[in-house]
Design a protein with these regions (language model features):
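An acidic, charge-biased composition feature
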Residues: 1-8, 32, 38-425
């Protein structure tokens, strides 16, 4: 398969170099971050005993590549991870896509032992340099739709103080060189995922999510929008239906998820509420019915009724849910309120699971390169499909109201402002 049309732009970039850009850890802590006095902390304790055989610290490399990530994943990341794993050098990996300072893939690699870190880093640098030399992205993000999109996201997602760290001389977001890569600090979002135990669980899940997306990129025609949207919707239904077995709880979650993505960017043209009803109607009856069958199968624990690809995801989602429930019941999850005002220590899985489900869904969609509009639309589609099938309240399904949008400010809803610039999503 070929890269998307953007990669055929006529201005090739310079060759790959690991550049020495700014250190993201120097950015100020956002309002939704974790203040020094917070109990939400990371796993590293200076007084902890050293274990030579324990996994090393995560390495983070940002690969600035203004094209489809598919060739980067299949021709570089997967072979690199496979080789390092086979040689006993790697304890884990995952990736996310991001746009800050230009479109890039954030690759996270955890050495099997601390002593392996230099080798893992060198091997990653060598593989990335070779790939970018042989398959450079030809599109430059200097003007046009993508530049405007990134500038809009920059304004919406970061405070004025945070933006100052990333401004160029022209007052716009600084762009890193295309076809380059940089080592950056790894900065887990402890407040979002529930502290060190929650971050460890998220990292385990992120590898499964990354593996799934790499396999989908290899075996499916994800360059076709219909295929991509259909896959994402089914994955969302599997995981959300596994986490939330009660129809009403699931519908409430989907409504809030939709309302957040739709309302957070309501001042832009990146969501289109007026088109949801028409697009849903044009789907016909077969797709909504498929979503309802998926929901029924996972709610009943009858994953053998699912296609193999979804069955594996359902089994992983169930294990992820069980591990999250165990952490909750032990009191090992501590979240930070989105306004940064307090810590939240849930002891009831009914409270904790939706708080984790939001970023879990979003980050899998991120790896699939889904857009803001996609997330708003698909959560609307899934909720409406369930309502049309009789789930929850027997009322006519409509797009969530302003009251529903307001509810996203409560615990468990995503936040669009004041995110950590080096965070994991």
């Amino acid at each position: 398969m070929t890269a998307p049309t953007a990669s055929s732009a006529p201005t090739p970039a310079s060759g790959p170099t690991p550049s020495s850009g700014p250190t993201l850890s120097s950015a100020p802590a956002p309002s939704s971050g974790v203040p020094a006095s917070s109990t939400v902390t990371g796993p590293h304790d200076a007084d902890a005993p050293h274990d030579a055989d324990a996994p090393g610290d995560w390495l983070a490399v940002h690969v600035f590549y203004a094209a489809s990530p598919r060739p980067l994943l299949l021709q570089c990341v997967k072979p690199l991870v496979d080789d390092l794993t086979r040689e006993g050098l790697l304890a884990g990996y995952f990736f996310i896509n991001y746009w800050l300072e230009g479109p890039h893939l954030r690759l996270r690699l955890r050495p099997r032992r601390a002593a392996d870190a230099p080798t893992v880093r060198e091997r990653a640098h060598t593989a990335l340099a070779a790939f970018l030399r042989e398959r450079p992205a030809l599109y430059e993000v200097k003007a046009g739709f993508l530049a405007e999109l990134y500038e809009t996201l920059f304004t919406l997602e970061y405070t004025e103080e945070q933006r100052a760290e990333f401004l160029g001389a022209d007052g716009r977001m600084r762009l890193r060189p295309n076809n380059s890569f940089e080592d950056r600090p790894y900065e887990p979002e402890y407040g979002k995922y529930g502290g060190s135990g929650g971050v460890a669980l998220a990292e385990w899940h992120f590898q499964h999510s990354s593996d799934l997306v790499v396999e989908a990129a290899r075996s499916m025609n994800l360059h076709l929008r219909t295929v991509l949207l259909g896959l994402s919707a089914q994955l969302m239904m599997v995981m959300s239906g596994t986490f939330l077995k009660d129809d009403e709880a699931l519908l409430t979650f989907l409504d809030r998820y939709h309302a957040f993505w739709d309302r957070a960017f309501s001042g832009t043209n990146y969501t289109a509420a007026q088109g949801y009803d028409r697009a849903y109607t044009e789907m016909g009856a077969s797709l909504p019915e498929r979503f309802r069958r998926i929901r029924d199968a996972v709610a009943r624990g009858e994953t053998d009724r699912l296609p193999a690809f979804l069955r594996g995801w359902a089994e992983h989602s169930a294990e992820l849910r069980d591990r999250a429930e165990e952490l909750t019941l032990r009191g090992d999850l501590t979240f930070r309120a989105w306004d940064g005002s307090r810590d939240i220590r849930p002891t009831d899985p009914a409270q904790a699971l939706p708080m984790l489900l939001s970023p879990y869904l979003h980050m899998t969609n991120n790896r699939l390169s889904m857009t803001i509009r996609d997330e708003a639309f698909l959560s609307y589609v899934l909720a409406r499909a369930l309502r049309d099938g009789g789930a929850g309240q027997p009322e006519t399904a409509v797009a969530p109201s302003e009251a529903g949008a307001e509810a996203t400010a409560t615990e468990g809803a995503p936040s669009a402002r004041g995110r950590a610039p080096g965070g994991e999503g």
